[in-house]
Each structure stands twice: as structure tokens, then as C-alpha cells.
Amino acid sequence: MSDRQAAEGPAFWSPAARRGSAGGVGDRRGVEESQAAASEKEDLESTNVSSPLASASDPAAESSPYRPQMVSPASKDTTEDLQNVAGASEGQAPGEQAALPAGQTQVLSEMAKYQAPQRPEDTVMIQSEHTGAIDVLSADLESADLLGDHRKVSPPLMAPPCVWTFAKVKEFKSKLGKEKNSRLVVKRGEVVTIRVPTHPEGKRVCWEFATDDYDIGFGVYFDWTPVTSTDITVQVSDSSEDEEEEEDEEEEIEEPVPVGDVERGSRSSLRGRYGEVMPVYRRDSHRDVQAGSHDYPGEGIYLLKFDNSYSLLRNKTLYFHIYYTS
């Protein structure tokens, strides 16, 4: 082989090449067509083997059909997972957040309970059917009391009474037995209430009482109501519950209805006017004279209750003396 053949290589001086170069135009065209078919087949194989992720991210893969890219099965699975995540994120709303852990969700729900809603203040207009006056109430309906807050104000606390006893029961009963309106009989199952108004010239109320043979229940209460008369009156009821109902009905009739009041209050609101000076307890008034006094807390009526509702068999003879001092 000559030096020229060795330099140009065996492919240049092969018989097929020499035939192509020495042959006609038809032989050269056949060789070119066979090379083009081989290139198209190679392009098709490289397209099937390359991954979708590489073809989408690498622009050189589309411009270089002669560069095959091999992708392992694990890489193909990873690519599919990434595509699924991307599709889910695109379908999610712009302002929507990902699901939070269970613990954090519970904390946020607890914090939401303490966020007070902001809303405008409610306004209520009440027109009187009698006077035509219009009252405008601007307040929160959840906390406003349309039944009259002025009647539900707690009365002032009562000062404790001063109580004592003395043993001269016979002398006491003998003296009061001769006086008028100082002796009465409390029948079995009854409650007697002696109503004693405050006196303009007095500063405290005093009481003394005793009974024959058996004890009796006794308690003192105060009714914060205007005094129209200083006369002492006696009220008798079958039981303590019946007496309270009668007092409530009487107060509902006597008390004027304020303008703009949409409804009457319940009995509990009316009972808020009463202050307890001394609760009802059974007293050994058949052994010792029970006595006591209480300073006036203001204008009102004292209610001295003699309770025999617990006795089903015996009547109680009561001797009492009630007066005021200055």
C-alpha cells in the first residue's frame, strides 16, 4: 500500500468507495438514500428511548437527533411523581394552603374561639301606647335586659340584728295578756306576717315575743318600698309558699308600670326588693322570751314572720310586743 493509501485510510480506498466514485450518478444516489433511511431509523429509536422530562428541559435533545438518552425505570417513576405533584399544585386555588398537622389545626381552632366578632351596635326603639313617647335603647341585645334593669339591682346589705333572751316568760305573758292586739293564735300549717313600717320619728325597730308550751319559727325581712302608712298590720297565710305568692301578686298590682317597659319582670325580680335581716328558724319561745332590735336601713316595711307551717297538729298561742325607738 502506498503512503497516500495509508494516510487516507482503508475506507477511502475500499472497493465500494472506488466503485461509487468511479460509477455513475445513479450509484451515488442509491448510497445517499440508504444513508438517509438509516438516519431516520436512528432518530426514531432515539426519540422512543429519551425521557419526557429530558426532552422538555433540555433543548439540545430536540436539536441533536443523533444523541440518544437512556433513562432507567426508577427515573421514569420519579418523573411521573413529579408530574403528578405539579398537576395537583396547579389545580389548587391560589389562596388555599396545604393541610396542616392535626396538632396545629387543634391549636388554631382553640384560638379562633377567643376572637370576638366585630359587628355594629344594635338599636331598639320602644314606643309607649299610653303617652306615645319613644325610648331609644342602643346596646348589645345579648347583655341588655329589656325587662327593666332598675328592678333587678341588688338591695343594700343588711346590718345584722341585735338579739337576746330573758327568762321572765310568765310575767311577760301575763302583762301582754291584758293588752289589746298583743296576743294571737297561729294555727297549724299557718304563717303569720306582721308588717311594721318604718316610723319617721324612729331609728330602729324592736320586738319581743313568747309562746305557750311549744316553739315557733321566726324570721325578719325588709321590704324596700315607700311607706304610705305607719299602721302595723297582720297577714295570715296557709303556708310560707302561699304567703310569698300573695305578696308578689299584691306588689304587681300596686307597683306602677314604668314607661317603655315591654314586659313585666318575673317573681324573682320582684323578690329582689326584699332584704333578709334574720332567716326563719325555730325559736324556743316557750322557754325564754325572744327579743331583738334592728337599725333602720332606710324607708320600708319590716316583715316579722311567725312560721308554724311545720306543725301539723298543734296551734301556737303567740304573745308579742313590737315598737320603735329613737
Swiss-Prot record:
Residues 50-65 have a biased composition (Low complexity). Residues 1-99, 234-268 are annotated as: Disordered. It holds the Pfam family GOLD_2. Residues 160-324 form the GOLD domain. It comes from the Eukaryota. Keywords: Acetylation. The keyword Acetylation applies. Residues 239-255 have a biased composition (Acidic residues). The keyword Cell inner membrane does not apply. The modification N6-acetyllysine is found at K170. This is Protein TMED8. It comes from Mus musculus (Mouse). The gene is Tmed8.
